Amino acid sequence: MVVVAMAAAAPVFRTTPSSRRSAVAATADALAAGIFLGAGLIHMLPDSAQGYWTYGASYPWPFVICGATIMGLALLERLAWGSGRSAAPALAAAIALAAHSFLAGAALGATSRQAAILVLFLALIAHKGAASFSLAQILTDSSLSRRRAMIVQSAFVVALPLGVVLGAVATRQEQAWPLVKPTILALGAGTFLHFGMQRHRTTAQALGIARQLAPWCGFALMALIAIVD
C-alpha cells in the first residue's frame, strides 16, 4: 500500500498531471465503494457490537462510535476543501485523509476474518492510490513549499501501516484490553461506511453499466464472505 501511495503521488510532484482517469480505475473505485459499505455494515459493525455485548455493555456504544466517526470525518473534509492557495486547507486535507488511512489500517489490523482481510486489502490499495494522488494535487496547488508538501505527503503514506500495527497489537492484547478491539472495529466501520458513501456518491452519476453494477458486486462479495468465512 505504501508503494502504491508513493507511486500515485510521484507524477504530481514531478509535473502537472492530467485530471482524466482511466475507465478501469473508475470501475475499480466503484467496486471499492461497495466493498467498503459491505465491510462496515456486514463485518465490522456486527463484530464490534458482539464484542461489547460479550463484556456486558448494554448501551449501543458501537453504533454511537460508528455514527460519530462518519460525522467527524465528514466535518474534517468540509474544513479541508477550502478555497484559495492557503496552506491551511491543504494541511486540513492531509489531516483528514491521514485520519481516514490510520483508522482504516487499525480496522484492517483488528479484523480476524481472513477472506475479508484479503478483499479489503485489495480495495484499500485502489482507494489509497486515488487518495494519495488527490492529496498530492491539493498540496502542490497550495502555498506550501515543495519540500514541506512532500513531508506532509509522506506522513499520509505511513498513516495506514501505523494503523495496521495498532490494530494488530490491540488484537493480541484482547484479554488485557477487552474493549479496545471492538472500539477499533466500530471506528473502522464508521470509516469504511464514510469511504463507501463518499465513493458511491461520486460513481452513482457515472455513465456505463460496469460502473453502475460495480458497487453492487462489491457489496454482494462482502455479503458472500460473511457466509463462507
Where are these regions (language model features)?
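Intrinsically disordered, metal-sensing/regulatory segments
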Residues: 1-229
